Regions:
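Walker A/P-loop nucleotide-binding motif
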Residues: 126-146
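Pre-Walker A (pre-P-loop) alpha-helix and adjacent loop at the N terminus of AAA/AAA+ ATPase modules
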Residues: 90, 103-131
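Loop/turn-to-beta-strand initiation segments
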Residues: 128, 158-159, 193-196, 225-231
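A short, basic N-terminal segment
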Residues: 1-111, 266, 275
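Short glycine-rich substrate-engagement loop in P-loop NTPases that contacts/grips substrate
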Residues: 107-114, 135, 139, 149-193, ...
Length: 275
C-alpha cells in the first residue's frame, strides 16, 4: 500500500514559505520625506535599500536633461576639434581653399567636371584613384582636383592631403639633412594617413633614380593600404615618338602602381585653356 503525500496549503511548491521575500520587498519600497538638494522643497522619496533619491521628480528630470545636453555639447566639440585638425593637416594652398563645384570657372570640360563631381560626391576609401591629364597648362586640372579635395574634406569630413609633387619630394629630401625634426618615415606616414592624397603636377621634374624610387614608394604605400590618390600631370600616359611620357619621369614601376590604383580612370583635358 503506497502513501500519498500532499503539500500543506500554506506552503509553496519549493518547500518553503516565501512570505519573508514579499515582506522584504515591501520594506525595500518604503517611502520617506526628503528635502530636494536643488530646490530645497520637501518631497516623498522611495527608499530602495541603501539608495534614496536626493532630488524631487522635477529637479531629477532637469538634471537628467542637463547631463544629456552636456554630453551632446561635448560630442559636438570633439567633432569640431577633429574637423579643425583635419583641415589644418590637409595643407590645401590658399589659392585653392575656396574652390568648389559651385564656383568653378566657366569653360571647364563638361565631361571632366561631371566625372570629378560624381567622384567627389560618391567618394569613399574604396574609390579608385583618378588622373587628370593635359599637356597644356591652364586647362583646369588642378582646379578640379581642388574641387574634389575641398568636397571630400569639408562635406564628407574625410582626412586628405593636398601636395604639389615637387613639394612632397623636397619635404622628403630635407629629412636627409642633419638636425631635421622629421624623418623620411614621418613624411611617408603623413602621406599614408590621409584617406585621400591629391598630388599636383606629377612628373614635372626631370627624373632621377631617387625620384623614381620615391614615387614608387608613395604609390606602393597607397596600393598596400588600398587608399586612393588624385593626380594631375602634363605628361602623357602613353609615349609617342620624341615625346616625354609619365613613365620617363616617375619610372615604369611607379606608373604601373598608379594605373593599378586608377583602374582606367584617366581624364584627358587636352586642348582647353581657362586662363
Amino acid at each position: 500500500m503506497s502513501n500519498k503525500w500532499t503539500l500543506p496549503q500554506n506552503q509553496g511548491r519549493s518547500g518553503g514559505d516565501l512570505s519573508h521575500i514579499s515582506t522584504a520587498l515591501s520594506q525595500g519600497r518604503q517611502k520617506m520625506k526628503r528635502v530636494c538638494l536643488d530646490c530645497t522643497e520637501e518631497f516623498e522619496a522611495v527608499v530602495l535599500g541603501p539608495a534614496t533619491a536626493n532630488y524631487c521628480l522635477k529637479c531629477g528630470q532637469k538634471r537628467q536633461r542637463f547631463q544629456e545636453e552636456t554630453k551632446r555639447i561635448a560630442k559636438e566639440q570633439l567633432e569640431i576639434n577633429r574637423y579643425r585638425e583635419i583641415v589644418a593637416r590637409a595643407k590645401i594652398p590658399p589659392k585653392w581653399k575656396e574652390t568648389n563645384f559651385d564656383n568653378s570657372k566657366p569653360g571647364l570640360s563638361p565631361g571632366a567636371f561631371k566625372m570629378a563631381k560624381l567622384y567627389a560626391e560618391t567618394f569613399s576609401v574604396q574609390s579608385p584613384s583618378l588622373v587628370f591629364y593635359s599637356p597644356e597648362n591652364g586647362t583646369g586640372k588642378t582646379h578640379l582636383a581642388a574641387c574634389i579635395a575641398n568636397h571630400v574634406l569639408h562635406v564628407k569630413r574625410v582626412p586628405i592631403l593636398f601636395k604639389k609633387a615637387r613639394d612632397l619630394m623636397l619635404d622628403i629630401r630635407r629629412t636627409f639633412s642633419d638636425g631635421g625634426d622629421l624623418t623620411e618615415a614621418d613624411i611617408l606616414n603623413r602621406v599614408l594617413s590621409a584617406q585621400l592624397l591629391v598630388l599636383d603636377d606629377v612628373g614635372v621634374d626631370p627624373t632621377s633614380q631617387w625620384l623614381q624610387a620615391t614615387y614608387w614608394t608613395v604609390f606602393d604605400r597607397r596600393v598596400e593600404w588600398q587608399l586612393p590618390v588624385v593626380v594631375t600631370t602634363n605628361k602623357p600616359i602613353e609615349a609617342h615618338v620624341g615625346e616625354v611620357c609619365l613613365a620617363d619621369r616617375i619610372g615604369d614601376g611607379a606608373l604601373s602602381r598608379l594605373l593599378g590604383l586608377c583602374q582606367g580612370n584617366v581624364i584627358d583635358m587636352s586642348g582647353l585653356d581657362l586662363r
